[in-house]
A protein has these predicted regions:
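Basic, amphipathic alpha-helical recognition segments used for DNA target recognition
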Residues: 9-13, 102-154
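A structural connector/turn signal
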Residues: 64-65, 91, 137
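Short, surface-exposed loop/turn microsegments at beta-strand edges and helix-strand junctions
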Residues: 27-36, 56, 68-70, 88-100
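Generic structural signal for buried aliphatic residues
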Residues: 74-77
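Sequence-specific dsDNA recognition surfaces
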Residues: 10-26, 42-72
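A short beta-sheet element
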Residues: 79-119
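Non-catalytic DNA-recognition/assembly elements of restriction-modification systems
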Residues: 1-33, 154-197
Length: 197
């Protein structure tokens, strides 16, 4: 079997930390206010590309530099444990990214699919590596330097897309099975309630 090509994440992308929100938060008495949608740690709940990412409203004292706003095909990584990555689709652009997150911009789309990178970063293989590098006792966080040094396995783009498609389909099937379980539990309860009356 042919060995997969690997490259460090720093060779494939640009990574920057989000904005420290307290610096831009509007004061109550401030007359200049700009309202944004902002990512929160809740934004990293299990989602797929077809859903909107959870956000909260953020009132800034002035406009925020576009480098701190999500762009299509960005991958956002939660730096506080549990470390999770989310893909930014066209539905989720222009959200403010806080300093608890890193923005990964793919600069090598000819060899790296951003959705594949998201799944790769969320894999148990990478999660185990990141756990070794977490710092802190009460609030564990990873460093951007650790992200930059991650080795990324790079199958051909076509294979990356096949992996993305498989995971998308598997997630849809899992969601459907969860819905069927919920419906079966409701039906079971209703039948039981009817029978004991």
């Amino acid at each position: 079997m042919k060995a997969l090509k690997t490259m460090k994440l720093k060779e494939l992308s640009e990574i920057k930390i989000g904005l420290p929100l307290e610096r831009k938060k509007a004061k109550l008495i401030s007359s200049d206010k700009v309202v944004y949608k902002s990512l929160t740690l809740k934004s990293f709940a299990a989602i797929d590309d077809s859903t909107n990412i959870h956000y909260e409203m953020f009132v800034a004292d002035s406009s925020i530099n576009s480098q701190y706003l999500t762009k299509e095909n960005d991958v956002i990584v939660r730096l506080r444990a549990p470390t999770t990555a989310i893909y930014v689709s066209s539905k989720n652009t222009d959200l403010v990214v806080s300093s608890l997150m890193a923005i990964i911009t793919n600069i090598s789309p000819n060899i790296l699919n951003s959705k594949y990178l998201t799944h790769y970063l969320n894999s148990q293989y990478i999660q185990n590596q990141l756990i070794k590098n977490t710092q802190g006792t009460s609030i564990q966080m990873i460093k951007v330097a650790d992200l930059l040094e991650l080795e990324i396995n790079l199958p051909p783009l076509e294979k990356q897309q096949q992996i993305v498609n498989y995971i998308y389909t598997a997630n849809q099937e899992i969601d459907l099975l969860h819905k069927l379980i919920d419906e079966k539990n409701k039906l079971k309860t209703e039948i039981f309630e009817t029978l004991i009356k």
